[in-house]
Each structure stands twice: as structure tokens, then as C-alpha cells.
Swiss-Prot record:
Domain (uDENN) ranges: 13-267
Gene Ontology biological-process annotations: anterograde synaptic vesicle transport; execution phase of apoptosis; negative regulation of apoptotic signaling pathway; negative regulation of growth hormone secretion; negative regulation of pancreatic amylase secretion; positive regulation of MAPK cascade; regulation of apoptotic process; regulation of cell cycle
In-chain residues carrying the UniProt-annotated modification Phosphothreonine: T1040, T1045, T1194
Record text on subunit structure and interactions: Interacts (via death domain) with TNFRSF1A (via death domain). Interacts with PIDD1. Interacts with YWHAZ. Interacts (via death domain) with KIF1B; links the motor KIF1B to Rab3-carrying vesicles in anterograde synaptic vesicle transport. Interacts with KIF1A. Interacts (via uDENN domain) with RAB3A, RAB3B, RAB3C and RAB3D; the GTP-bound form of the Rab proteins is preferred for interaction.
Name this protein carries in UniProt: MAP kinase-activating death domain protein
Keyword Membrane: yes
Gene (UniProt): Madd
Tissue: Expressed in all tissues examined with the highest expression in brain.
Region feature Disordered, mapped onto this chain: 105-167, 603-635, 676-840, 870-920, 1030-1089, 1113-1231
Residue ranges of coiled coil: none
């Protein structure tokens, strides 16, 4: 599953292996490399010299008497894996025995005096018997058809003859092998059999031309020369000519084009069409299973289901496994089958399908300390006498069908139930289906004709979607082997996605970084705690490297078939890997290896002559010596190995002498002369269909040279129409359960999909995100409609091409009116991130906070919804119609808490959930209000508060309101968090709440952290920064009066006597919550956010406006949004090294204007009818508030919050301290805090203070709250889990996890400088949180050695870069001298980000759909009105931007692939949006101005004038456009160009001609039309920018009016 690099070669090498001088005296010889093609090594893949041992694992065997057996003509597969890069190459080998004759006296002179004379003299002359091989290697291998193979040995009983007494004949093993990066096993095998047949046929043809020479000797000669045993110069010109053409055939085969996954197939004609059909090479697209070109169910047949699952358990749990068998083919394919069966997991350790017996020191690989899967021949351990098998290796004997456990093996855990029973049932059904007489559904010939069986397909679809998943029945696929393989893989995927195995896996992963490669932490403890049934198997599986790597791979998966299976798509026609299911949908490339003008055609047409003379070997072995070379024919395996050991086989890596061709002079003549048509043949032939079917036509069309192939690139001709028809039929059948979708809708989607990816139908691409729905055991208890949505693939899409249905929301939000029309969120591109449209696999009590935890990493959250692909965007109206869905917009939110139970519980009604959630929030608001007013929590409320705070989202909700720091926009960008003074009464109430929160965190930790524990960062920030002073005058002050501390003033004195400050703090916005229509449970929070990932515009009758207590004059002033959200503190975006974490409160401005269009990043939802722009910080209040804090209800049109610097999960950011330390020092400056009592001291059990204080403390304590220090602080796993949760939240807040697939793709496309900047951002985020983690652990008096160990482990786990890791190490080095509050808290990077959001309408007026356009640091994000990311336009892709103040329309030109697209938006704040984007782009350009120059202006392009047909050059210069043709030259000045655009490959230029005062249109046909248009637009932008800057310099400053 590793993303493999594209290899431009279909075949890397073709080699011939055997013995150059076969010996009749020994059973086995050292195998030698006899021929290799090409002669030179490829730079990135030299030919490994030990390939000879893999081709002949037990040596080059020889035998005297031939006995035909299944091993006489065999093929098998091996792999060669590069130990440095991990790249795997496949070897496909065909082994056969060619006969040779013992050296006779008359042959001594045969060598002549040539350079190989001596060698030839010792070479035994052989009469070739290879042409007689026709037996198959078993049911799994298919050599060529009977008509293409000589049949001399087809009837051994009738072929028995006595041998001539003067001939003692031997046969020697010979191997033909192909090495390739591509696993086309069956087709490569056919190529090798074809090569063998060509040599055999040429040998047969020579029999009639040399009547004086015995037939056997003459037939021998061809193979002896081909294998290098005889000199070329001595042989006849006819033989050399044949060999030359055979070698030219090999080189043409090596130059075959490579198929493109999901787009192009290659049809290779290796022999004339009437002799053998063309071989098809095709790769499935990523939405299908990866190609497995062998019987994957083979281990199930050989071992049985139970034993096979036992071996799979060993493999999954990382035990060492060795398989052995006499049959190489069964051995290697079984190993590869086991590896393929664990998909979507990947085996992370060495895999060697075939380890040769005769290779020296091969047994040392079995001593490796790591797990492995290795296949060895049955002779391996007998041959390695001195080797002792390690006592921890599981041995699987495929011949005896036994699994032998090692001596000290631990007992394998049994697979969990009921999943195990289901898996066994499905596997047995799949195997049983092969014994039935039912016909397979799909027919290969009909597929090539573009036909299908819609009746069966439709029935399958209806059955599939109307029955529970446990009714899965592989019999529906028919009884063909390929469908059984698909059924086997489907059963395994469904097993992994079951509740007791890996379902819900991604809920427990935390993305730590994406660049330079993804790093994901897997929280195994919470994962195991979420299993419905605790099993040893799941516990051990969770600790394996395969599961850990799966978390990284799933961020940007290279294959999506498992997601389609999770969405109940099982049909092989949709997910199958074999070309017969999809080849008809691909563009064909026809390539001819065989030249019909070659004289090889004559040899192929000669009927094989079979007489008694031509069969010198008795198949029955009935003459004097009953001796066979095959190990299977020995009385025992030991006898065979004993004979092998008598032979002198050198198993060391051989030193290969430079080889030559058998007859061909130089390969270059083949490559240049013969393959030139491939470069030119881009257009389809005039009648490519006929040229395939009619040999005379093809022959006449390729009249170049006798050895030159005619390479034909077929056009689409009639196939696209047929494949569209197939797609339509398939789509119609599949979408039958969705009656509202007319066939025309799916058809339009099919057409678009074909043009995009070449795959038949977008309707087939319906896979949900992994591990969401329960697949095994009892079905989840849900409402019928919700379960239907969860299990029903949605293929519908608007006929107009809109993407409205691609914008997902939880199923509970889907209303009955639009659930059918709602489509999947995935784009049709194979590389698109796949988003899930269901949250039903996990518990019903989901809230604002928990959803972020659940969705943070890939495609779960709205923030990560797939962006549309090119095809999805190219519509007449580029934006979807979102009208009609607005009722569902309420409560659409990103999640904060990712953990939740996997097993579903019966949820209460939506009204009940919404009511409970609102009541809980309102209750906690009142408690917080009471605390901030100095009235405390209250004895009667304490029990309920404790119970409610067991929910992480409610913990964050309360902590966000407790944090009492006021900030301005400038304060938000400061680095150090200021202390906050509160009154003693407020202190007491806050301490009670914090202690309740700690108790609830203890409860969460006891349940393995389910629900998340990042709130501890917010709690400890409050504890470290909030204090009361013991001075008498300060003890009489108001509870929250002094929170606003201006920079440079003593925090203890600032704000005194300021009534407004008191009013602000006393009136947090505690309006009642809007009832949630879709709450997941009683603890749900109805939260909304302008956050980049999760903006939600909620409109509807359920929304209740908040209640404000402020007077009219106060409404217009800046207020503290007490319920603004909090987000995790993280790395600062600033460049100075000491930028640190803190939190900032959302400042809310309530505007009385109904037309207000400014809203600065609040945690609130904007009214959908108002035209707003939000100056949103990416931090806590805006970004973070979306994650962790519950905000007040939706604002009305006039209630818009502004908060440019937003709060974080840790509460609000505090005012800057009067004295800042230099950036190099992490330690806080010393100050007089002797009279201050901080909240953290109460958490530790305060040991200072008067007796009166202690008595008062005791009186304030409740029976349920302990004064002692919690033991939670000593649990290192708790700190690790809290850190991982915090990283996830901060990444969400900074927009680092919005569509990880797109982010990774962009990273790979950037230059080195930009990549480094992105890596630095991630390092800074991680270092900031690690710094704060150290500070909090110090605060709670954690053992300092434990701090060092844990932080260093987390630092290594996060792969923090050298610069930032050095900073953390410096802090750890000073740890001995640090205590308590000595280490300052760094502010979060999310709070340093500033984003502005504007409400826009698609099109030129307000009739267009509403979108929210967010202007970020490096891109513009377009969100739908439910907060889903619709588009993300990176600044490097924007070409031009203009606006019209009169029409209020903004025009954006952007580069989309190779095309330039124009998008128009209407907004009342058109001018502000324009300058906002312009300023942001200028800042982005300034970051790389000195390092990365922009693209050069202008360029030259070939064009053809549409009027005259004349060709020429179009030059774009700074002065204008210059057109050069053969007979004339035209120059068009820049100021005369009125318009330019492209229309289907035609560049249209409109020129204003001053002489005639008219506009003249010029049209030029060119394949570079888009490049020309792009170049002209860049030129206009450049000229406009230059003129603007010049005007600014000339314009004098205006006098200021008095």
C-alpha cells in the first residue's frame, strides 16, 4: 500500500538462467546467467546477480530419464526488495527442461578455432526437447493453449519407445524470467511462454531444412546458441536470422508502454491476432482493490479456513512465520496472499515469498530479530544441515496442511466473537461458491463489448442495500475464481471494520505533524477502552506497527477500496481488481511486439512434425535407468537433498561476466528503428478496429522494416460510448434504492467522470470513511432512517453539477426531505480525501467538544471535507445551490472531543437531546455567573456540577468562562500571559470549580481518557495566572474588577475604580441556547464557530436570540464575550523564538445596525441574511472557540461579534506583564508575589496563610472535594494523552488539518524554502506545547526526572526539528533550578493568526448562493453556508483579481490544472475584500520575495491563424503581443487589447483598431491556448501594479483638514 513511484518501464529485464555446460553426472549445478536483456543496467535498478538463485532455488537440476510430471514445466513468482528504499520488484519465472546429449567424440571438433572453441568443445551437444513441454504446473497456472504448444508428450502411454543404444540423453533445467516493478504475473507468464514457443517453432522449422543432420541435434542447436553454449559464428545464416528476430522481439517487448492506473490500458500483440489474442495490461484506480494477479484464496484451499486464520493471527500479531512447500508457485503465492489479505493494514516487516535453498547464508535471514514472513522450498532445512531453527518461528507446511507452533510459543489469542464466526462463515461461503455450477455474473467478452447484465446487477444492488450487513452473501458474485478472491478480501476488510477489532480506529489517533511526512500518535488505551468487549487479540493488535502506521497512511490513503466496502459496496464490478471489470472503461493503447512481416510468421505457421525420431526420450522412463530429476519423483525428499548435497553448488553471489546477444548486433538498432512509430503514433489509426481484426490490413500498414513494429495508439473509437452505457446501467442498478434520483442525473455524472479519470461512473464511487458503521455482531440501535443513510451508498448528484450534496453533516442533521438527495462528500478524483457522512458508529452523546476530537485528523470533520476536483468544478455555475437545506444548518459543528464509545446507545429524541444540552449549558452558565459574582458554587449545586463536568466538552465550556483576562487586538499578539487578580470570594468559587474539574479528569483518566483531556491545559493556565491578594484593601475589591491590565502598569493596580470593567465582567453573555435539532445526547453542546474548519451559519425557527442585560449605551461598546470559545494553545506564528502560548478572550461588539458587515472572529454563528465580514483570528476565540468552548446562541442580523484576537482552550489571553524577558530566557522574571495566593496552590493543598485562612478554607470545603493534591498529577500517561489532545486541537485552530490530503499534495508541489517554512510552523507548534507542558508539570510538583523522560519521549515521538528541540532541551537542563511558576506560559500560535471573513454571493448579484470567503495567510478559503470548505485557493494559483465598485462584483482568475478559470462574487464589501486579499497576498509574497522569484513574464507560443491556416509564433512582451508568420508580422499594443479568452483550444484576442475605431477579433488554434491566456493576464497584472506604485509615488500627501 506504500505509494509506489511510477516506473516508466513495463519490464525491467528479461533473463535466461541455467547451466552453460550441463552435466550428466550430477543432479544439480550452480545456476548461471546465460542471457540478459538489455545488456546494460538501469541506473536506479541494476540487475541483481543473485537472481539466478531465485530462478532455480534448488540449483540447476539435471536428469537422465525424463518422466513428465507437474514440475517439469512450471512457473512461479518471487520478489526482490531493495533494503534501502523498500521498493519491490517482481520476478516471473518459467522453468522447463531442455534435453541435451552427452558429448560424443565427433563433437569435439565442433568448437572450431573461435574464441569459444575450447568452451564449445566441452559443451555437451544436446538435441532439444524443450518443444515437447506442455504439462501445466497445476490448476493455478495456465500455459499457452494446446494449439500453440507441441503435443508430443500429451499422451505418454502412446509415446513409449526404446532408446538407441548409443545415446544416453539428459535434460537440464532452464529458466526464462521477467523482472518488473508491476505485478502482472499472468500476462508476463504468457509472454515467457510465447518466447519459448518462438524458439521451439524456429527449431521445428529448421528440421526440414537440414536433412543430413539428425532432428534432435538440429533442434538442440537453436537452444544451445540461445543459451550461449555454442558459438554463433559457426551456425547457419537462417538460424542466426531467426535468433536475431527473436531478440528483436524481446527488445520490443521490453519497450512496451506502461498502463496508467484508472486511465489507460495497454493491449500488447505478442503474436499475430489469429494465433493469440493481444495481452491486456491494466491497473485499477485507487477506488478498487490493488491488483492481485494470482489466486488470493489459495491459502484457504491449501490449509483450510481455520488454519489459515491461525496463520493470519500470527502475521497480524507480528510473530515470525515460515512457510514451506515443494511447489514454488504455491509457496510464493501463499506468502503474497497472506500479505494481501490483511488489507487495509500493511505488513511492516520483511516479506520473502521464496528464499532459495542453494543461496549461501540464506538461512541467516531466519535469525533476524524482527518479525518476518518467509517462504522456503521443502528442501531448505534438510539442505542446511548445520542450521537450527529459532524457537520463536511458526512453521506452516503447505504440503501437509499443518501449522507447527514453536517450542516456546505463547498461546495465540482467539479472534473476537461474533466477528470470528462471521468471518469464517463468509470465507467458507466464498470457497463453496467455486464448487457450484452457477454462472458468473460478469462475462469478459461482453465487458469488452460494453455490455453488462443489468438484471443481475440491479438485483444485487437491491438485495445489498435492503438487508443488514450480516446477510452478506458472496454467492451473488458467481463462481469464478476472481470473484471469490474479491469476496475473500471483502470479508477481511469487514472483519477489520468490526466493533471488536478496528472500528472507530481513527477516533483515537492524533496527528502530530504532516510535514515532511505524517506523524500520527495512536492512543491505544482509549481505543481498547472503547471496545464493546475486551479481548486479548484486540489488545495485542493495537500495539502492532501495522496499526500504528495505518493511522499515518489513512491521512492520505493510496487506495480507497476499504472505504467503499465500509459503505456496503461489494460488487466486483465496482471494486474488483482484475482488468475484465474495468478495462472497457480505459483508453486503449495498442502496441505490437510481433512484426507480421517477420519470417517468424513462417515458423509459427509450420505444422509441428511429430515422429518417432523426434522423440528420443521416453516419458515413462522405461529404459535402463529409472531416474528423474524432480524432487517430487524421489522416494523421499531426503534422497533428493542427499543427491543435491553431493553436488558442488556455489551459493555465493556470482560474478557475472559481461554478456552479449545471441545473434543481434546492437540493441540500439531495435530501439531507434523499431520504436520510432511509438513516438509519432499519437493519433488513432484510420480504422484501428479493422486493423486489429484483419491481418492483411495490419500487415500492409506496417511495411517499414521486417523487424519494425507498428505501434498504434488507439483512439476512443466506439469504446467510450459503450463504456458510458455500461456505467449508466451499473449506476441505474446501484441507485435503485434512491428513487428521487433520475437516471439522467447519474448519466451526466458518468460522462463527467469518464472525462476526468477514465473510470466508468462516479456513481460507483461511494465509499465512506473507515470504521464508522458497525459491520459485525448485532446491528446498532438507531432510527431506521438514520441506519438507512449509514448503510446506503449515495450516488446522486444534482443534474446541474452543483456540489451542494457533497457538503456533509452528521446524519442526525439530515432531514427527511433532503436525505435522499444528499450525496457523498468524496470528489471523483482517485486522490481525493474521502470524507465520512455518518457519525452513527459511535456513541449518541456527542457534543461540540467531542466532535472535534472525533474528527480532527482526516476526513471525519467538516474541516477536512474533500475539495471538488476539476471535473466537479467545471460547471456552468461553479457553486452549488444550497437553498432548501438551511433547516439542516443548525448545530453543524466541528468536534472537539474525538473519543467516544464505539458501541451505539439508543439516543433520546432530537428534542430531548437538544433540551438536555441547553439545560446543562444554562445551568453551568448560572453556576459560573454565581462564582464570578462571588457567591460560590453552592452546596446544593455541587453534586450536579461534578456530574456534568465529567463531560470534556462541558469542562471546556466552564473553563472558557472562568478565565478572566481582557485583551485588545494588540494584547492578543503578545507572547507572555499576564496574571489576573480576582477577589477572595471569586477565588473560593473558582477553586471549587477547578477541583470539581480535576475530579472529573480523574474519572476520565480512569476510563482511559475517553472523551479527551485537553481541558487540563486550560485549567492549569487559570490556576497559574489567577490569584487574590491578601492585602486588606484588595480583599475588599470587586470580584472581577481588575482583569483589564494595560501593558506597562502594575497588574495589581490596573483598572481600579473602573466601573465599566466591572460591568463588563458581571454581565457575561449568557443568553439561552438555541435548542439543538440534532444533539447527540443529554450532554451535547450547541456550539457554532466561524472557525476555518467549522464555520456554521445557523438559521431557522429554532434559533433563540441571546438575552443581554446591557443598557443602550453599553451595547455599542466593546464587551467581554464570556462564552467565547477556547482553543488549544500552540505554536506561535511569529518568528521570534520565544513566542509562547496563552489564551485570549473573544471581544464582542454588538452593533445596532441591521446592515452591519463587519464581524471579527467570534465564536458565534453569523446570521445568514446579513452581509458580514469577520476579522477572525485563527486562535481560541475564533478558531479555538469552534473547538472547545460553547458559544451563545446564533446572533441576529444586528448582533455580530468581532474578535480579531481570539481565545484558546486555555481560557483568554492575559494582559502583558510590565517587564518582558528576552526571547532567549524561558524563565519568568522575579516579582513580589508573597502576598498573592494563586489557584494552583489550592489544587496542591495550600501550606501558607494564617490560621484564619485555613479555617475559612475548611469551611468552604465540601464533603466531596478533597483538599489534598490529586494523584492524577503523578500519572505520566495522563500528561501524554493531554498533550496529544492539545496538539490536535491547536492544529485544528491553526487550520493545519483541513484536508490533510490536499495539504500534503501542496507541500510536495512547493519549493524547498516554502516546505521548510511549513515544517518550521509545525515544529514551533509542538515546541510551544511541550514548553507549556513542562510549565504545568512543574506547577503540579511532578517528579522532575519523570518530566525529563516524558517530555523527551514526546519530543522524539513528535519528530521535532533540531532548532526547537534544542530550546526544549535547554529548558529541561535548567529543570533542577525551576519550581512552581518559574517557567512562563507561551501563547498559542492560533491566537496570532488573523483571518478575515466576508459573506459573498456566487455570481453578480444577491441571487447567487451564499458563501463565506476567509482570507488567510497563504490562501483564500471559500466555505458553504454550513461551514464546509468548498474551495481553497492558494495564492500561488491566483492569476489576477479585479473589482467593480459600482456593481460590487469581485473577479478572481485562478489557475486550475492547465486551465484558467474566472470566478465572480457579489458582496457589499467588495472594496474591503479586494484590499484584504491584496494585502494578504503581498505579505505572503514578501515572505519569499528574496528567495523565490516569481514566474517570468511573457513567452513564445506556436499558433495557427484560424483565418489563413498559416502557422507561426505568438510572442507576449511587456509592450504587447507580437505575431510572427511566414509572410507577415503583426504587433498589437498592450493598450489596444480589449479582451482575451480561450475556447476549446482556440485563443481568442479582441483588438481595438484606432484607425477604423472598431474591435477586431483574432482567433488562433494552439495546444497552449491556456498558457497564452495565463501569460497575458500576468502581463496585465504586472503593468497595473507598476502603474499603481508609480502613481503612489507621484501623488503628494493630502493636507489634513482642521
Amino acid at each position: 500500500m506504500v505509494q509506489k513511484k511510477f516506473c516508466p518501464r513495463l519490464l525491467d529485464y528479461l533473463v535466461i538462467v541455467g547451466a552453460r555446460h550441463p552435466s550428466s553426472d550430477s543432479v544439480a549445478q550452480t545456476p548461471e546467467l546465460l542471457r540478459r536483456y538489455p545488456l546494460e543496467d538501469h541506473p536506479e535498478f541494476p540487475l541483481p546477480p543473485d537472481v539466478v538463485f531465485f530462478c532455480q532455488p534448488e540449483g540447476c537440476l539435471s536428469v537422465r530419464q525424463r518422466r513428465m510430471s507437474l514440475r517439469d514445466d512450471t512457473s512461479f513468482v518471487f520478489t526482490l526488495t531493495d533494503k534501502d528504499t523498500g521498493v519491490t520488484r517482481y520476478g516471473i519465472c518459467v522453468n522447463f527442461y531442455r534435453s541435451f546429449q552427452k558429448r560424443m567424440p565427433k563433437e569435439k571438433a565442433e568448437g572450431g578455432a573461435g574464441p569459444r572453441g575450447k568452451e564449445g568443445a566441452h559443451a555437451p551437444c544436446a538435441s532439444e526437447e524443450a518443444a515437447t513441454e506442455s504439462s501445466e504446473s497445476g490448476s493455478t497456472l495456465q500455459p499457452p493453449s494446446a494449439d500453440s504448444t507441441p503435443d508430443v508428450n500429451q499422451s505418454p502411454r502412446g509415446k513409449r519407445r526404446a532408446k538407441a543404444g548409443n545415446r544416453s540423453r539428459n535434460s537440464t533445467l532452464t529458466s526464462l524470467c521477467v523482472l518488473s516493478h508491476y505485478p502482472f504475473f499472468s500476462t508476463f507468464r504468457e509472454c515467457l511462454y510465447t518466447l519459448k514457443r518462438l524458439v521451439d517453432c524456429c527449431s521445428e522449422r529448421l528440421l526440414g531444412k537440414k536433412p543430413g543432420i539428425p532432428r534432435g541435434v538440429q533442434r538442440d542447436t537453436m537452444w544451445r546458441i540461445f543459451t550461449g553454449s555454442l558459438l554463433v559464428e559457426e551456425k547457419s545464416s537462417a538460424l542466426l536470422h531467426d535468433l536475431r528476430e527473436i531478440e528483436a522481439w524481446i527488445y520490443r517487448l521490453l519497450r512496451s508502454p506502461v498502463p496508467v492506473s484508472g486511465q489507460k490500458r495497454v493491449d500488447i500483440e505478442v503474436l499475430p491476432q489469429e494465433v493469440q489474442q493481444a495481452l491486456t495490461f491494466a491497473l485499477p484506480d485507487p477506488s478498487r482493490f490493488t491488483l492481485v494477479d494470482f489466486p488470493l484464496h489459495l491459502p484457504l484451499e491449501l490449509l483450510g479456513v481455520d488454519a489459515c486464520l491461525q496463520v493470519l493471527t500470527c502475521i497480524l500479531l507480528e510473530h515470525k512465520v515460515v512457510l514451506q512447500s515443494r511447489d514454488y508457485n504455491a509457496l510464493s503465492m501463499s506468502v503474497m496472499a497472506f500479505v494481501a489479505m490483511i488489507y487495509p493494514l500493511e505488513y511492516m516487516f520483511p516479506v520473502i515469498p521464496l528464499l532459495p535453498t542453494c543461496m549461501a547464508s540464506a538461512e541467516q535471514l531466519l535469525l533476524a530479530p524482527t518479525p518476518y514472513i518467509i517462504g522456503v522450498p521443502a528442501s531448505f532445512f534438510l539442505y542446511k544441515l548445520d542450521f537450527k531453527m529459532p524457537d520463536d518461528v511458526w512453521l506452516v507446511d503447505l504440503d501437509s496442511n499443518r501449522v507447527i507452533a514453536p517450542t516456546n510459543a505463547e498461546v495465540l489469542p482467539i479472534l473476537p466473537e461474533p466477528e470470528s464466526l462471521e468471518l469464517k462463515k463468509h470465507l467458507k461461503q466464498a470457497l463453496a461458491s467455486m464448487s457450484l455450477n452457477t454462472q458468473p455474473i460478469l462475462n469478459l467478452e461482453k465487458f469488452h463489448e460494453g455490455q453488462e447484465t443489468p438484471l443481475l446487477l440491479g438485483r444485487f444492488s437491491n438485495d445489498l442495500q435492503s438487508t443488514p450487513s450480516t446477510e452478506f452473501n458472496p454467492l451473488i458474485y458467481g463462481n469464478d475464481v476472481d470473484s471469490v478472491d474479491v469476496a475473500t478480501r471483502v470479508a477481511m476488510v469487514r472483519f477489520f471494520n468490526s466493533a471488536n477489532v478496528l472500528q472507530g480506529f481513527q477516533m483515537h489517533t492524533r496527528t502530530l505533524r504532516l510535514f515532511p511526512r505524517p506523524v500520527v500518535a495512536f492512543q491505544a488505551g482509549s481505543f481498547l477502552a472503547s471496545r464493546p468487549r475486551q479481548t486479548p487479540f484486540a489488545e495485542k493488535l493495537a500495539r502492532t506497527q501495522a496499526v500504528e502506521y495505518f493511522g499515518e497512511w489513512i491521512l492520505n490513503p493510496s487506495n480507497y477500496a476499504f472505504q467503499r466496502i465500509h459503505n456496503n459496496t461489494f460488487d466486483p464490478a465496482l471494486i474488483g481488481d482484475k482488468p475484465k471489470w474495468y478495462a472497457h472503461q480505459l483508453q486503449p493503447i495498442h502496441y505490437r511486439v510481433y512484426d507480421s512481416n517477420s519470417q517468424l510468421a513462417e515458423a509459427l505457421s509450420v505444422p509441428p512434425e511429430r515422429d518417432s525420431e523426434s522423440d528420443p526420450t521416453d516419458d515413462s522412463g522405461s529404459d535402463s535407468m529409472d531416474y528423474d530429476d524432480s524432487s517430487s519423483s524421489y522416494s523421499s525428499l531426503g534422497d533428493f537433498v542427499s543427491e543435491m548435497m553431493k553436488c558442488d553448488i556455489n551459493g555465493d553471489t556470482p560474478n557475472v561476466d559481461p554478456l552479449t546477444h545471441a545473434a543481434l548486433g546492437d540493441a540500439s538498432e531495435v530501439e531507434i528503428d523499431e520504436l520510432q512509430p511509438q513516438k509519432e503514433g499519437e493519433e488513432p489509426g484510420p480504422d484501428s478496429e479493422n486493423s486489429q481484426e484483419n491481418l492483411p490490413l495490419r500487415s500492409s500498414s506496417s511495411t517499414t522494416a521486417s523487424s519494425s513494429p507498428s505501434t498504434i495508439v488507439h483512439g476512443a473509437h466506439s469504446e467510450p460510448a459503450d463504456s458510458t452505457e455500461v456505467g449508466d446501467k451499473a449506476a441505474t442498478g446501484i441507485s435503485k434504492p434512491l428513487p428521487p434520483v433520475p437516471p439522467s442525473i447519474c448519466k451526466s455524472t458518468v460522462d463527467r467522470r469518464q472525462t476526468e479519470t477514465g473510470e466508468g461512473s462516479v456513481c460507483q464511487r461511494t465509499y465512506d470513511h473507515p470504521y464508522f458503521e458497525p459491520q459485525y455482531g448485532s446491528p446498532a440501535e438507531e432510527d431506521d432512517d438514520e441506519q438507512g443513510e449509514s448503510y446506503t451508498p449515495r450516488f446522486s448528484q444534482h443534474a446541474s453539477g452543483s456540489r451542494a450534496q457533497k457538503l456533509l453533516r452528521p446524519n442526525s442533521l439530515k432531514l427527511a426531505s433532503d436525505s435522499d438527495a444528499e450525496s457523498d462528500s468524496r470528489a471523483s478524483s482517485p486522490n481525493s480525501t474521502v470524507s465520512n457522512n455518518s457519525t452513527e458508529g459511535f456513541g449518541g452523546i456527542m457534543s461540540f467538544a467531542s466532535s472535534l476530537y472525533r474528527n480532527h485528523s482526516t476526513s471525519f470533520s467538516l474541516s477536512n471535507l474533500t475539495l471538488p476536483t476539476k471535473g466537479a468544478r467545471e460547471k456552468t455555475t461553479p457553486f452549488p445551490s444550497l437553498k432548501g437545506n438551511r433547516r439542516a444548518l443548525v448545530d453543524q459543528k466541528s468536534s472537539v472531543i474525538k473519543h467516544s464509545p464505539t458501541v451505539k446507545r439508543e439516543p433520546p429524541s432530537p428534542q430531548g437531546r437538544s433540551s438536555n444540552s441547553s439545560e446543562n449549558q444554562q445551568f453551568l452558565k448560572e453556576v459560573v455567573h454565581s462564582v464570578l459574582d462571588g457567591q460560590g458554587v453552592g452546596w446544593l449545586n455541587m453534586k450536579k456540577v461534578r456530574r456534568l463536568l465529567e463531560s470534556e466538552q462541558l469542562r471546556v465550556f466552564v473553563l472558557s468562562k472562568l478565565s478572566r483576562a481582557v485583551q485588545s487586538e494588540d494584547d492578543a499578539r503578545q507572547d507572555v500571559i499576564q496574571d489576573v487578580e480576582i477577589s477572595r470570594k471569586v477565588y473560593k468559587g473558582m477553586l471549587d470549580l477547578l477541583k470539581c474539574t480535576v475530579l472529573s479528569l480523574e474519572q476520565s483518566y480512569a476510563h482511559a481518557g475517553l472523551g479527551g483531556m485537553a481541558s487540563i491545559f486550560g485549567l492549569l493556565e487559570i490556576a497559574q495566572t489567577h490569584y487574590y491578594s491578601k492585602e486588606p484593601d484588595k480583599r475588599k475589591r470587586s470580584p472581577t474588577e481588575n482583569v483589564n491590565t494595560p501593558v506597562g502598569k502594575d497588574p495589581g493596580l490596573a483598572g481600579r475604580g473602573d466601573p465599566k470593567a466591572m460591568a463588563q465582567l458581571r454581565v457575561p453573555q449568557l443568553g439561552p441556547r438555541a435548542p439543538s435539532a440534532t444533539g447527540r445526547g443529554p450532554k451535547e453542546l450547541d456550539t457554532r464557530s466561524l472557525k476555518e474548519e467549522n464555520f456554521v451559519a445557523s438559521v431557522g425557527p429554532e434559533v433563540i436570540k441571546p438575552v443581554f442585560d446591557l443598557g443602550e449605551t453599553e451595547e455599542k461598546k466593546s464587551q467581554i464575550s464570556a462564552d467565547s470559545g477556547v482553543s488549544l494553545a500552540s505554536a506561535s506564528q511569529r518568528t521570534d523564538q520565544d513566542s509562547v502560548i496563552g489564551v485570549s478572550p473573544a471581544v464582542m461588539i454588538r452593533s445596532s445596525s441591521q446592515d452591519s458587515e463587519v464581524s471579527n472572529s467570534s465564536g458565534e454563528t453569523l446570521g445568514a441574511d446579513s452581509d458580514l465580514s469577520s476579522n477572525a483570528g485563527d486562535g481560541p476565540g475564533g478558531e479555538g472557540s469552534a473547538h472547545l468552548a460553547s458559544s451563545r446562541a446564533t446572533l441576529s442580523d444586528s448582533e455580530i461579534e468581532t474578535n480579531s484576537a481570539t481565545s484558546t482552550i486555555f481560557g483568554k489571553a492575559h494582559s502583558l506583564k510590565p517587564k518582558e524577558k528576552p526571547a532567549s530566557s524561558p524563565v519568568r522574571s522575579s516579582e513580589d508575589v508573597s502576598q498573592r495566593v494563586y489557584l494552583y496552590e489550592g489544587l496542591l493543598g495550600r501550606d501558607k496563610g494564617s490560621m484564619w485562612d485555613q479555617l475559612e478554607d475548611a469551611a468552604m470545603e465540601t464533603f466531596s472535594i478533597s483538599k489534598e493534591r490529586s494523584t492524577l498529577w503523578d500519572q505520566m500517561q495522563f500528561w501524554e494523552d493531554a498533550f496529544l489532545d492539545a496538539v490536535m486541537l491547536e492544529r485544528e485552530g491553526m487550520g493545519m488539518d483541513q484536508g490533510p490530503q490536499e495539504m500534503i499534495d501542496r507541500y510536495l508541489s512547493l519549493g524547498e524554502h516554502d516546505r521548510k517554512r511549513l515544517e518550521d510552523d509545525e515544529d514551533r507548534l509542538l515546541a510551544t506545547l511541550l514548553h507549556n507542558l513542562i510549565s504545568y508539570m512543574l506547577l503540579m510538583k511532578v517528579n522532575k526526572n519523570d518530566i525529563r523522560k516524558k517530555v523527551r519521549r514526546l519530543m522524539g515521538k513528535s519528530h521535532v526539528g533540531l532548532v526547537y528541540s534544542q530550546q526544549i532541551n535547554e529548558v529541561l537542563d535548567q529543570l533542577t533550578n525551576l519550581n512552581g511558576r518559574d517557567l512562563s506560559i507561551r501563547s498559542s500560535g492560533s491566537r496570532h493568526m488573523k483571518k478575515q471573513t466576508f459573506v459573498v454571493h456566487a455570481g453578480t448579484d444577491t441571487n447567487g448562493d451564499i458563501f463565506f470567503m476567509e482570507v488567510c495567510d497563504d490562501c483564500v478559503v471559500l466555505r458553504s453556508n454550513i461551514g464546509t470548505v468548498y474551495e481553497r485557493w492558494w495564492y500561488e494559483k491566483l492569476i489576477n483579481m479585479t473589482y467593480c465598485p459600482k456593481t460590487k462584483v469581485l473577479c478572481l482568475w485562478r489557475r486550475n490544472g492547465s486551465e484558467t478559470q474566472l470566478n465572480k462574487f457579489y458582496t457589499k464589501k467588495c472594496r474591503e475584500l479586494y484590499y484584504c486579499v491584496k494585502d494578504s497576498m503581498e505579505r505572503a509574497a514578501a515572505r519569499q520575495q528574496s528567495i523565490k522569484p516569481g514566474p517570468e513574464l511573457g513567452g513564445e507560443f506556436p499558433v495557427q491563424d484560424m483565418k489563413t491556416g498559416e502557422g507561426g509564433l505568438l510572442q507576449v512582451t511587456l509592450e504587447g503581443i507580437n505575431l510572427k508568420f511566414m509572410h507577415n508580422q503583426v504587433f498589437i499594443e498592450l493598450n489596444h487589447i480589449k479582451k482575451c479568452n480561450t475556447v476549446r483550444g482556440v485563443f481568442v484576442l479582441e483588438e481595438f483598431v484606432p484607425e477604423i475605431k472598431e474591435v477586431v477579433s483574432h482567433k488562433y488554434k494552439t495546444p497552449m491556448a491556456h498558457e497564452i491566456c495565463y501569460s497575458v493576464l500576468c502581463l496585465f497584472s504586472y503593468v497595473a501594479a507598476v502603474r499603481s506604485s508609480e502613481e503612489d509615488l507621484r501623488t503628494p500627501p493630502r493636507p489634513v483638514s482642521s
